[in-house]
């Protein structure tokens, strides 16, 4: 019987492995429920049950544990923010808040199900990402984050610092109480042309890099997800200093292939290859088209330090047989 932990250990060490593994994940509840685990216990239970069902059906090579239900940050979720100055009302909630304690219990219950069989990574959003997601997913305002950020960068940076301080504790405590292998950190550039490189270096990098430093203190194997999809794009140059060991970006959205990205990120381990948008190859292609694509993908990118995955989260409706096929093709075309 295949030892998936040994397989992924080789891959995460950028070594030649018997096959190219796969890594796909999806959400378990609606966007608004992403923020509601503490007020509705059924949300948390659906996410826990969903992970267990996903593991049983998909038999993944490793697991990214979704933070569905714990998106955002309690102070953001419970503070009326209409103008940039309101961001100064965002405060750290501290180590005893239910958002800390219940989230750790939630991760542990999921993780204990399969951590002895596969590598596990817990999803953490960068401090600024926590704010953006609440405005966009819960309030439905896709322009608010950039508008307030550009209106008063210091106020947004202050709010992000409050969240970063809580994330430091959460991450450290997760590794003390849960047998996690690493963190999957989701980051994104500010979606506004006025937020240039110097803006990111002054207002985005400090809290992002603080979170990364905390993550690296806890584990050597972590995944950086540069979140792009649809109209959300990223300049990969903004993330050159984000020194985590495995990189996942939107190869299709950013028009940067696995081979190009692996070279750009100094030969780090990379995850990706498939567009995650609906009615694309992953969900709509034939088996023959999938095989031709993977053959071409691996001939181009190579098979050392490569994991076949997608730009971002995928639809939960894709039949599990598709992932079984991709896994077999990763073995067939391993050089």
Model-derived features: where do they sit?
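N-terminal beta1-alpha1-beta2 module of alpha/beta enzyme domains
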Residues: 41-45, 49
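Glycine-rich loop at the start of a catalytic domain that most often binds anionic cofactors/ligands
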Residues: 34-38, 73-82
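Membrane helical hairpin/interfacial module
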Residues: 48-72
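Active-site gating loops and adjacent loop-to-helix segments of metal-dependent hydrolytic enzymes
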Residues: 83-91
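Active-site loop segments of alpha/beta catalytic cores
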Residues: 1-29, 33-38, 50, 61-65, ...
């Amino acid at each position: 019987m295949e030892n998936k932990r040994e397989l992924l250990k080789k891959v995460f060490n950028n070594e030649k492995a018997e096959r190219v593994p796969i890594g796909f994940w999806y959400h378990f509840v609606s966007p608004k429920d992403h923020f509601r685990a503490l007020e509705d216990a059924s949300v948390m239970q659906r996410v826990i049950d969903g992970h267990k069902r996903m593991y049983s059906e998909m038999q993944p090579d490793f697991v990214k544990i979704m933070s569905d239900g714990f998106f955002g940050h309690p102070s953001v979720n419970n503070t009326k923010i209409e103008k940039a100055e309101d961001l100064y009302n965002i405060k750290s909630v501290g180590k005893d808040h239910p958002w800390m304690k219940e989230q750790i219990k939630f991760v542990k219950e999921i993780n204990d199900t399969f951590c002895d069989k596969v590598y596990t990574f817990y999803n953490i959003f960068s401090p600024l990402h926590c704010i953006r997601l609440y405005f966009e997913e819960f309030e439905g305002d896709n322009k608010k984050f950039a508008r307030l950020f550009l209106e008063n960068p210091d106020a947004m940076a202050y709010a992000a610092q409050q969240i970063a301080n809580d994330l430091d504790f959460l991450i450290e405590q997760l590794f003390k109480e849960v047998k996690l292998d690493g963190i999957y950190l989701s980051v994104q550039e500010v979606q506004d042309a006025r937020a240039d490189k110097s803006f990111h270096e002054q207002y985005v990098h400090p809290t992002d890099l603080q979170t990364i430093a905390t993550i690296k203190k806890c584990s050597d194997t972590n995944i950086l997800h540069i979140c792009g999809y649809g109209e959300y794009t990223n300049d990969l140059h903004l993330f050159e200093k984000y020194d985590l060991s495995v990189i996942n970006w939107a190869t299709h959205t950013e028009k940067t292939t696995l081979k190009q990205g692996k070279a750009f990120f100094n030969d780090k381990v990379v995850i990706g290859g498939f567009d995650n948008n609906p009615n694309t190859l992953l969900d709509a292609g034939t088996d023959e088209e999938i095989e031709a694509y993977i053959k071409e993908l691996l001939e181009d990118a190579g098979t050392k330090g490569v994991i076949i995955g997608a730009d971002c989260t995928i639809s939960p409706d894709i039949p599990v047989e598709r992932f079984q096929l991709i896994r077999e093709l990763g073995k067939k075309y391993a050089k």
